[in-house]
UniProtKB/Swiss-Prot annotation:
This is Cobyric acid synthase. The keyword S-adenosyl-L-methionine does not apply. Residues 248-435 form the GATase cobBQ-type domain. Keywords: Cobalamin biosynthesis, Glutamine amidotransferase. The active site is at residues 329, 427.
Length: 484
């Protein structure tokens, strides 16, 4: 059994992408490999086969390994629900919400969960490919660390350090990070990978030579800047779009402070007939064919922000002019009469009026609903698959016109009597080509092109493995992975 860890000099250095690439590259070599991230902080999560939730990056990495996502792949998930606090999820299940100080004291317990998951995976797979979090050199976070070197020291594994040259200062990032580590941690770093390089590699070579001489550690390769790679972002919203047809559907997503699972919109971003715009604070909602209210980790707080920004008025105007509106998960809850949080699960206990566009109310309960589901959209009876991650129980007359009939016999969500508003708890409803096409036709797009989002994701994972083969020292990587 071998464990290899990828750490980064900064957030968004390329850790998730590199782990995904290495997982598929190893799989091509006939090696059974499994992804692992000790601790993740993200509002994008995926439902696992064992009924829990993990970070979506680990779900993509599982796909790279051709494995079903499992809670052991990300034993600790932190989902921020305020500027200073987060919901703590252990082995896929919400334990409690804590502020940063309380979680610091809780880390020893969290580490036990991390090590238990790693032990199970390492007993089943010959290679465990680990992703760190942020940077290992955050001085204020090093005590009790479970996400980076604290984990590497505990399981005695080698580390690859990756840095993003596109940001500038790559040599300072690498050398500075190394200098801030302890001697034993420095010894764990077996090499560097430089990510997102553009230009002539010959011009970079003197710097690479200096880095190897300065640190005594090898540069394992330089990965190029790739502009059209479309894998799900771990947390930041990806606003890139490809070339669009002239006849497009204009779709607006208001970005709320605690937006969650915004990867729901990746298929729309890639669709050639959709002009997807994320609207932030201070921006008015422009004329559009479709507005989508996304998921939220703090529904009442985000409702207050929506009103403060005047977006409730803009949504009402949009509907008066015949536009379509979708609410997903937290967005579904916002569309109703009221949202009640008697236990204070997402902030101070209390109730808030919803937008009042659909006749139902939601009560947030401690037991979270986590399941992968399939069924048929009420629109065209198109097949749909997705997943539920929500603490709300929603009841009211509007649910008598459901948006989805689920294969397990339940119904989900609602469609307004005038057909303008659709609400659903299902994340991922745009990923299926037929369900996506049905929703786009409902929103007003004629002659919809069907795209195979799963095939696009698989194509990009294969491209990442190709980059490993072409640009990294695969012989050295095989040694680090214990592969002959």
């Amino acid at each position: 059994m071998t464990t290899l860890m990828v750490q980064g000099t900064t957030s968004d250095a390329g850790k998730s992408t590199l782990v995904t690439a290495l997982c598929r590259w190893l799989l091509r070599q006939g090696v059974a490999v499994v992804p692992f991230k000790p601790q993740n902080m993200a509002l994008n999560s995926a439902v696992t086969a064992d009924g829990g939730e993990i970070g979506r990056a680990q779900a993509v990495q599982a796909q790279a390994c051709r494995l079903a996502p499992h809670t052991d792949m990300n034993p600790v998930l932190l989902k921020p629900n305020s500027d200073t606090g987060a919901q703590v999820i252990i082995h896929g299940r919400a334990v409690t919400s804590m502020n940063a100080v309380a979680y610091h004291d809780y880390k020893a317990i969290a580490m036990q969960a991390v090590l238990a998951s790693h032990q199970r995976l390492s007993g089943e797979y010959p290679v465990v490919m680990v992703e760190g979090a942020g940077s290992p050199a955050e001085i204020n976070l090093r005590a009790g660390d479970i996400a980076n070197m604290g984990f590497a020291e505990a399981v005695d594994c080698p580390v690859i350090l990756v840095a993003d040259i596109n940001r500038g200062g790559v040599f300072a990032h690498l050398v500075g990070t190394l200098e801030l580590l302890s001697p034993t941690e420095q010894a764990r770093v077996k090499g560097f990978v430089i990510n997102r390089f553009r230009g002539d590699i010959a011009l970079l070579q003197p710097g690479l030579d200096w880095l190897e001489q300065r640190t005594g550690k090898p540069v394992l390769g330089v990965l190029p800047y790739v502009t059209d790679l479309h894998l799900e972002a771990e947390d930041g919203i990806d606003v890139r779009q490809g070339a669009k047809d002239e006849r497009v559907l204009k779709v607006i997503v208001p970005v709320l402070p605690r937006i969650s699972n915004h990867t729901d919109f990746d298929p729309l971003r890639l669709h050639p007939q959709v002009d997807l715009q994320f609207i932030g604070p201070g921006q008015p909602i422009p004329p559009a064919d479709l507005i989508i209210l996304p998921g939220s980790k703090s529904v009442r707080g985000d409702l207050a922000q929506l009103r403060e920004r005047g977006w409730d008025t803009a949504i009402a105007r949009h509907l008066r002019y015949g536009g379509k509106l979708i609410g997903i998960c937290g967005g579904l809850q916002m569309l109703g009469r009221e949202v009640h949080d008697p236990l204070g699960l997402e902030g101070p206990a209390g109730s808030s009026p919803g937008l009042g566009l659909l006749d139902y109310a939601t009560v947030l309960e401690a037991q979270k609903q986590l399941r992968n589901v399939a069924g048929a959209l009420s629109l065209e009876q198109s097949p749909v698959a997705g997943y539920e991650i929500h603490a709300g129980v929603t009841q009211g007359p509007a649910l008598q016109r459901p948006a989805v009939q689920l294969a397990d016999g339940r119904s989900d969500g609602a469609i307004s009597a005038d057909g303008q508003i659709l609400a659903t708890y299902l994340h991922g409803l745009f990923e299926g080509s037929q369900s996506c096409a049905a929703l786009l036709r409902w929103a007003g797009l004629a002659d919809v092109q069907q795209i195979d989002y799963e095939a696009l994701r698989e194509r990009d994972i294969e491209r990442l493995a190709d980059l490993v083969e072409k640009h990294l020292d695969t012989a050295h990587l095989r040694k680090l992975c214990g592969v002959a």
